[in-house]
Amino acid sequence: MTAKKDDTLSPQITTAGDTRRLEFNGTDIAGVTAEPLTPPDHVVYRWLEFSDFEDWAAVANWAVDLFNAGETQSADFKSAAAAINTKSTPEERAVAALEFVQSQIRYFSIALGESSHKPTQPDIVLQRRFGDCKDKALLLVALLKQAGIKSSPVLLSTTRRKGLDQSIPSPSDFDH
């Protein structure tokens, strides 16, 4: 577990069996009022972060395992891949794959349980004809692979523009 520490407030640590308890107490802590429209990168409140990830490489490895499309075998997938592969150049195939995912798969998110972070397999997305950003990204990567185009999904934050290097390693920093 990695912890980023604010040295102005130290925990009282107690241990009972396999459980370690950190208790933080503060008195006379000044209140903070955030200004309207403050950029999300500028955090004015105190907070405490914990992570099970030792470094950013561990976060990347966690994500790589989630974004494994396996072998896509459905007739829908084979049909979409065949249509994309009728294009002559890699650029045309990439555009065709992107246009297919954008126009044929509705955006709909069911972010409950494992679906909050693990993409649905491409065959299921094609059968349902809907998926969230993760689902559509994994489908696009699988279609591009069938078109002979190497690609990889990436994690990103739509709200944080900077400061990631000052966060503790955690997938919670990403929302897409």
Give, region by region, the residue ranges found by the protein language model:
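Hydrophobic/aromatic-rich core segments of domains that either
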Residues: 134-176
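Active-site-proximal structural scaffolding
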Residues: 17, 74, 90, 94, ...
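Contiguous, function-dense segments enriched for cysteine-driven chemistry
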Residues: 91-94, 123-124, 152-154, 164
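Secretory-pathway-linked proteins and extracytosolic
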Residues: 1-115
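Conserved hydrophobic/aromatic pocket- or pore-lining residues that grip, position, or stack substrates
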Residues: 97-101, 133, 144
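Short, conserved phosphate-binding/catalytic loop or strand-edge motifs used
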Residues: 76-79, 113-123, 157-162
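Second-shell loop/turn segments in exported
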Residues: 80-88, 122-130, 165
